[in-house]
Regions:
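Enzyme catalytic cores with a strong preference for nitrogen-chemistry domains
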Residues: 1-184
Length: 184
């Protein structure tokens, strides 16, 4: 509702924002995934003209993937899954998905990336206007500077705008640093 009142065209939430992270063994529970899907549909019903990208676990034929649900015109238009499972806490609970996909949001060609897939730049269409990466990266000494430098270098080399949205807060023994930025 706040995004509507401020005239936003797009609102973006971090990886697994809907389920919380790490959701661990809950990601293997069909009922939990179904509840996440219901909550996603509820969010979509409130979006109206605003596009949204929401981090959510999605059950596929191969298992549960971490995905970016793209909401347009009040409906979940598609889910783009994380390709590279690199965090040990995710292994065993998540499976690999198809990775980066290019979509059109608000008239812009956008490469949507989930998780660490941003570090593998060869996987996105070079004709995009914006690279949007949703993430749930934990705090690590020097990592915020490293991520900002990586984004800056990628924006410079590829001549692209980059939007990184990272989880903020804490869960179990993990603290998320909230490294979010727009570069380019």
């Amino acid at each position: 509702e706040r995004a509507k009142s401020e005239g936003a065209d797009l609102v973006v939430f971090a990886e697994q924002a809907l389920s919380g992270t790490p959701a661990l063994d809950l990601l293997c529970k069909t009922t939990f995934i179904e509840l996440c899907e219901e909550a996603l549909d509820e969010i979509a019903s409130h979006c109206g003209r605003i596009a949204a990208v929401v981090g959510v676990p999605v059950l596929t034929e191969c298992g549960t993937v971490s995905a970016a649900a793209v909401i347009q015109h009040g409906e979940v238009a598609r889910c783009i899954s994380k390709r590279f499972i690199t965090a040990r806490r995710e292994m065993g609970f998540l499976v690999q998905g198809s990775g980066c996909e290019t979509i059109t949001i608000c008239g812009e060609r956008v490469a949507v990336i989930v998780g660490d897939d941003l570090s593998r730049t060869s996987n996105f269409d070079k004709s995009v206007d914006l690279i949007l990466s949703i993430n749930a990266r934990r705090f690590g000494k020097g990592m915020m500077t490293y991520r900002y430098n990586t984004m800056h270098d990628l924006a410079y080399v590829e001549s692209k705008r980059i939007m990184l949205i990272n989880q903020v807060g804490g869960s179990t023994d993990i603290v998320y640093d909230g490294t979010s930025a727009v570069v380019g």
